[in-house]
């Protein structure tokens, strides 16, 4: 009899658990998110989310809101199996977006005043722009966790990232923290300075970015010359054009005059996934880990 009662209790608990979780999520609303487009009130837990931001998509799935996402833009390619569509974050079509009947739209740019246009027809929008640093990246993850009713998981994600980054940064000996770095965006030598998000990651390691001195317009993304790069002889070369443009350590070594560069001679040329290097979501930890591994090479 006791055994049967325990079985019935367990079965009842299993049935009630989803309901209890739903109630717990619902009780967190309404919630006010202090986003880039002002204080946004999310009245109820969203179940029809559209993400027009590749980083936003990664953040949403990381915090456990994947099942709440019904559509993502055509540049969102991670994680595997995201509900890809022809929607664009760069040329947003308000009518097409509205056709999905979303209760929350996440964007990283307010192109063509898409935020106001969507809000005008009653759609809640969160503007989560490109982060300038890790602190901002963490804040956006927390905001999306709050906006979707996934605060515990968002907190866990951020905590995990913070701990991982601390460990990764400490893994590089002090003697190797003063290396010079060249971050390549494309084969025409566009780069990123220390004023950019990715540049600040290098700065955390203590690296000196060769693009800084060449950024005369202070754009953050100067175009360098082959001669300048060769003369600078960076200790580390990071290829963020490996997917788009098939650049590799071998192709870099084959460039005229590049075989004498410190990074080439000491095998510190690394090809990274373009998407990972251009986003500010959870996978930035993977990027930092790869950079640390190259930096430790003697």
Residue ranges and their predicted role:
Residues 2-5, 17-55, 152-183, 293-298:
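Bacterial Sec-exported substrate-binding components of ABC uptake systems
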Residues 113, 136-137, 141-146, 155, ...:
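Structured C-terminal subdomain patch of bacterial secreted/periplasmic proteins
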Residues 75-80, 112-143, 147, 151:
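Flexible loop/hinge segments that line or gate small-molecule binding clefts
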Residues 48-110, 207-210:
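A short, structured surface patch at a secondary-structure boundary
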Residues 195-220, 271:
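His/Asp/Glu-enriched short active-site or ligand-binding loop at hydrolase and phosphoryl-transfer sites
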